[in-house]
C-alpha cells in the first residue's frame, strides 16, 4: 500500500514539472507567464521561445503522462489502474505545485496518458487534431474538438468494435475527465474564437479567413 501511495504522489509530482516555464527561464531568460497567453504549455512555448523549445516542451509534457501511466507496470503494482496514475500526472501538469498551482492546458500530457494505455485511440485523436488544424489553423480549436471526439469515441467505438473492442468504464470516466479539463482550460480561447481574434498557426487552410496574429 505504501508503494502505491508513493507512486501516486510521484505521478502528480512528475506531471507537475513545468518544463516550459523552466526551459524559458534557464535557457532564454524569459518567464512564459509574462509573454503571449501567459501559459507554460507547448503552444505558447512555440510562439515565444521558438520551434526547438516548443518541440522539447511538447515531448517532455507528453512523456510525463506516458511515464506516469506506465509506473505501475514498472513497479509491478496490481489493484490500481494505470489510468489513475496518468490522471494524477495531468492534474499535476494543470495545477503544478512548482508553479503556484498554475499550469498548462493538459493536451500534451493527456495525449501521453492515452499513449501509455491505448495508442490506437491516440492515433484516432491525432488524425482528428490534424484535420481540424489543417482546416482552421487553430491549435486551441483542434484541441477542443479532439476532446469532443474523444468523448464520441468512447461512446461509439465499443458498440461497433472499432479501436475499442469493449466498454471500459474506468477508461471512459478518465477520458471524460480529461476532455472536460481540456475544454475548461480553453475557455478563453473559445471566447476569442467566437470573437474572431484567436491566434493562428502558419499551417492549413484557415477556413475562418481570420487574419493571423
Swiss-Prot record:
It is an enzyme of class 2 (transferase). Keywords: Cell membrane, Lipid biosynthesis, Lipid metabolism, Membrane, Phospholipid biosynthesis, Phospholipid metabolism, Transferase, Transmembrane, Transmembrane helix. SMART domains: G3P_acyltransf. GO terms for molecular function: acyl-phosphate glycerol-3-phosphate acyltransferase activity. Its main location: membrane. One of its GO terms (biological process) is phospholipid biosynthetic process. It is a multi-pass membrane protein. It comes from the Bacteria. GO terms for cellular component: plasma membrane. It is found in: Cell membrane. It catalyses: an acyl phosphate + sn-glycerol 3-phosphate = a 1-acyl-sn-glycero-3-phosphate + phosphate. The keyword Mitochondrion does not apply. Pathway: Lipid metabolism; phospholipid metabolism. Pfam families: G3P_acyltransf. The chain crosses the membrane at residues 4-24, 48-68, 71-91, 113-133, 144-164, 165-185. InterPro entries: G3P_acylTferase_PlsY. Its EC number is 2.3.1.275. The keyword Transmembrane applies. PANTHER family: GLYCEROL-3-PHOSPHATE ACYLTRANSFERASE-RELATED (PTHR30309:SF0), INNER MEMBRANE PROTEIN YGIH (PTHR30309). Probably interacts with PlsX. Catalyzes the transfer of an acyl group from acyl-phosphate (acyl-PO(4)) to glycerol-3-phosphate (G3P) to form lysophosphatidic acid (LPA). This enzyme utilizes acyl-phosphate as fatty acyl donor, but not acyl-CoA or acyl-ACP. NCBIfam families: glycerol-3-phosphate 1-O-acyltransferase PlsY. Belongs to the PlsY family. This is Glycerol-3-phosphate acyltransferase.
Amino acid at each position: 500500500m505504501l508503494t502505491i501511495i508513493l507512486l501516486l504522489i510521484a505521478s502528480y509530482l512528475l506531471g507537475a514539472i513545468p518544463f516550459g516555464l523552466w526551459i524559458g527561464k534557464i535557457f532564454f531568460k524569459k518567464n512564459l507567464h509574462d509573454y503571449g497567453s501567459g501559459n507554460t504549455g507547448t503552444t505558447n512555448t512555440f510562439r515565444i521561445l521558438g520551434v526547438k523549445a516548443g518541440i522539447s516542451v511538447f515531448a517532455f509534457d507528453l512523456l510525463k503522462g506516458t511515464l506516469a501511466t506506465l509506473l505501475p507496470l514498472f513497479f509491478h503494482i496490481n489493484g490500481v489502474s494505470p489510468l489513475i496514475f496518468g490522471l494524477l500526472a495531468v492534474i499535476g501538469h494543470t495545477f503544478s505545485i512548482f508553479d503556484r498551482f498554475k499550469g498548462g492546458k493538459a493536451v500534451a500530457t493527456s495525449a501521453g496518458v492515452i499513449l501509455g494505455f491505448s495508442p490506437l485511440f491516440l492515433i484516432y485523436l491525432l488524425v482528428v487534431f490534424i484535420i481540424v488544424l489543417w482546416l482552421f489553423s487553430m491549435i486551441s480549436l483542434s484541441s477542443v474538438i479532439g476532446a469532443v471526439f474523444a468523448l464520441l469515441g468512447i461512446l461509439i467505438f465499443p458498440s461497433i468494435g472499432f479501436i475499442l473492442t469493449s466498454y471500459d468504464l474506468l477508461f471512459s470516466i478518465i477520458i471524460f475527465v480529461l476532455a472536460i479539463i481540456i475544454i475548461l482550460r480553453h475557455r478563453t480561447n473559445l471566447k476569442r474564437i467566437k470573437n474572431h481574434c484567436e491566434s493562428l498557426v502558419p499551417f492549413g487552410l484557415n477556413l475562418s479567413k481570420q487574419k493571423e496574429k
